[in-house]
Amino acid sequence: MEERMNVLHDFGIQSTRYLQVNYEDSQDWFVLVSVIADLRNAFYVLFPIWFHIQETVGINLLWVAVVGDWFNLVFKWILFGQRPYWWVLDTDYYSNSSVPLIKQFPVTCETGPGSPSGHAMGTAGVYYVMVTSTLAIFRGKKKSTYGFRCLNVVLWLGYWAVQLNVCLSRIYLAAHFPHQVVAGVLSGIAVAETFSHIRGIYNASLQRYCLITFFLFGFALGFYLLLKGLGVDLLWTLEKAKRWCERPEWVHLDTTPFASLFKNLGTLLGLGLALNSSMYRKSCKGELRKSLPFRLACIVASLGLLHLFDSLKPPSQIESIFYILSFCKSATVPFASVSLIPYCLARLLGQTHKKSL
């Protein structure tokens, strides 16, 4: 089994080497693609846009992103996937030959296990929601037309073009092996397709959100403690990253599995708090919600405020404090987009309307 994995990993290393040598001029493009494909953009950019265009799509998108990334964490703990940037330097597979020269980049040195790819899985799931939702909006109750069929082809071609670029980006940056990005894409689509059949997420109570958040945290923590009790070190990848990353400053605490877990759980709980708040009911359930200028104002204000939130980085000197602050910061993202900003704008527009009378 180990020999087969070594052959598979060697194929991945050769693929990375080929891309880095033959597409050296595309370095900036691949780095940009990897940055854009980060799941953070689904929370800070795509969610507020889609929520204020059509609430159900935004809610579905956030659930797919959060639960998909949670499954990604569990899969990584089970599969113990290597990453190219440390495997090529750590393995004895090349003991009788020269070690392939693999470049590293500022976004290469992620600290979690490599399989499946979180970038590929997140992008596949989130963009699947956007494509299928867009097609559902344009399809409506009408029969399929030539224009709709063209839109269908264009959107799916665009979808697979995005997935291809994300996969090539992760391989180029030596962050993942080819089989890991393929597994990520398939897993992301599976999660998104599953949630397309779950209707309970659109009217879930705050109690249900709390229970699900607690379950996801409890399961992950219990699974971690169980494997640790069996002698399995689930933080083995952090040592690999610190040892083999070209520059220490490229190793970031926010790429650890627990950092991802706390950010996702905070986001989910924040959505539950927002959707069940009085501010949301007062601002998003009235006639004002149907106004296009109001929705556009909510989108612009949300993107601006969330950009400020994103620039605030919790101190990472103490891990426990970092995780708690990451949880709280993530919870404010959907809460601000869904309830706080619409409520403030509704009050402001209401007062302006009264003065005009």
UniProtKB/Swiss-Prot annotation:
Sequence motif Prevents secretion from ER, location on chain: 354-357
Glycosylated residue positions: N96
Catalytic activity: D-glucose 6-phosphate + H2O = D-glucose + phosphate
UniProt EC number: 3.1.3.9
Spans within the Lumenal topological domain: 1-28, 82-117, 169-170, 233-254, 313-320
InterPro entries noted in UniProt: Glucose-6-phosphatase (IPR016275), P_Acid_Pase_2/haloperoxi_sf (IPR036938), P_Acid_Pase_2/haloperoxidase (IPR000326)
Entry keywords, A to Z: Endoplasmic reticulum, Gluconeogenesis, Glycoprotein, Hydrolase, Membrane, Transmembrane, Transmembrane helix
Residues reported to bind substrate: R83, R170
Subcellular location(s) per record: Endoplasmic reticulum membrane
Spans traversing the lipid bilayer: 29-49, 61-81, 118-138, 148-168, 171-191, 212-232, 255-275, 292-312, 321-341
Cytoplasmic domain ranges by topology: 50-60, 139-147, 192-211, 276-291, 342-357
Single annotated GO MF: phosphotransferase activity, alcohol group as acceptor
GO biological process, one term: lipid homeostasis
Active site per UniProt: H119 (proton donor), H176 (nucleophile)
Topology class, membrane: Multi-pass membrane protein
Main location: endoplasmic reticulum
Family per record: Belongs to the glucose-6-phosphatase family.
Function summary: Hydrolyzes glucose-6-phosphate to glucose in the endoplasmic reticulum. Forms with the glucose-6-phosphate transporter (SLC37A4/G6PT) the complex responsible for glucose production in the terminal step of glycogenolysis and gluconeogenesis. Hence, it is the key enzyme in homeostatic regulation of blood glucose levels.
Name of the featured protein: Glucose-6-phosphatase catalytic subunit 1
